[in-house]
A protein has these predicted regions:
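Contiguous, often N-terminal, cationic amphipathic patches that form binding interfaces
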Residues: 1-50, 55, 74-79, 83-106
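Generic structural marker for isolated residues within well-ordered, non-membrane alpha-helices
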Residues: 58
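Short acidic capping loops at alpha-helix termini that bridge into adjacent secondary structure
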Residues: 69-71
């Protein structure tokens, strides 16, 4: 299982967010929960208060995926480190390649 999958008319992206980090970065590996579900590790320098870290995460995703923030929505995990983000654009090969490229190589 990957940290993303086609979902409805778009894509579901699973993220493990680490706020208050030294730098904004996408991780080189994934977090796997007890059920085997993968989450891409992402760190942001912003603190986790009043949704600031979530906003920073969406900005990072928008910039790297070249998608408007308005096309993304955190559908699960507003106040948790484990998040599910719905990307409301067609799941194409191009989008899949961009998502794969988020995971940095070690």
């Amino acid at each position: 299982m990957s940290f993303f999958e086609p979902y409805k008319n778009g894509c579901l992206l699973r993220i493990k967010l680490a706020p208050n980090a030294a730098k904004n970065a996408f991780g080189a590996d994934v977090f796997v929960d007890a059920s085997g579900t993968e989450y891409l590790k992402v760190s942001v320098v912003t603190v986790a208060e009043k949704g600031k870290a979530n906003k920073e995460l969406l900005k990072m995703l928008a910039k790297n995926l070249k998608i408007a923030v308005s096309n993304m929505e955190i559908i699960c995990g507003q106040t948790d480190h484990l998040k599910k983000i719905f990307i409301n654009i067609s799941f194409t090969t191009e989008l899949e390649q961009k998502l794969v490229s988020l995971k940095k190589e070690k």
